[in-house]
């Protein structure tokens, strides 16, 4: 997934957006460091999709209620043989990030890191040096 042997030229961190409370969502402001690297609309669509997926994960519904009841009735041993709704959505997020890296970010010399690896505090985007720029040195 990472561009082969390209040195890291920097990292960009997309911070959490607490304007709507403590739910997990990230700022969609386009970082200047990504200018001429990736389309602004594509970046915003990626962040919007991630925000929607995290909202889906945190949504309380019948399934979450049932999981909680089953957990109490089984002294939480139910989770040894079944995934929670939250875990299922986290897997969906990891798959989405992997697809975005393969199709959009890696070809541009970028790498999205799953926010779960950073404690859901930031979306980390690693910027790799352009081969054209680094070969001229």
UniProtKB/Swiss-Prot annotation:
A lipid is attached at residues 69, 72 (S-palmitoyl cysteine). GO terms for cellular component: Golgi membrane; Golgi stack; palmitoyltransferase complex. The keyword Cell division does not apply. It is a lipid-anchor. Keywords: Golgi apparatus, Lipoprotein, Membrane, Palmitate. It holds the Pfam family Erf4. Its main location: Golgi. The keyword Nucleotidyltransferase does not apply. One of its GO terms (biological process) is protein stabilization. It is found in: Golgi apparatus membrane. Belongs to the ERF4 family. May be involved in protein transport from Golgi to cell surface. The ZDHHC9-GOLGA7 complex is a palmitoyltransferase specific for HRAS and NRAS. Interacts with ZDHHC9. This is Golgin subfamily A member 7.
């Amino acid at each position: 997934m990472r561009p082969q042997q390209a040195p890291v030229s920097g990292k960009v961190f997309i911070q959490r957006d607490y304007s709507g409370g403590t739910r997990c969502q990230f700022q969609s402001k386009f970082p200047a460091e990504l200018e001429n690297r990736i389309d602004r609309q594509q970046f915003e669509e990626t962040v919007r999709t991630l925000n929607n997926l995290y909202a889906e994960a945190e949504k309380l519904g019948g399934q979450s209620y049932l999981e909680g009841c089953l957990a109490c009735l089984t002294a939480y041993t139910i989770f040894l043989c079944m995934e929670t709704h939250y875990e299922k959505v986290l897997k969906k997020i990891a798959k989405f990030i992997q697809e975005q890296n393969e199709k959009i970010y890696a070809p541009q010399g970028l790498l999205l890191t799953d926010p779960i690896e950073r404690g859901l505090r930031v979306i980390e985007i690693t910027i790799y040096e352009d081969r054209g720029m680094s070969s001229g040195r």
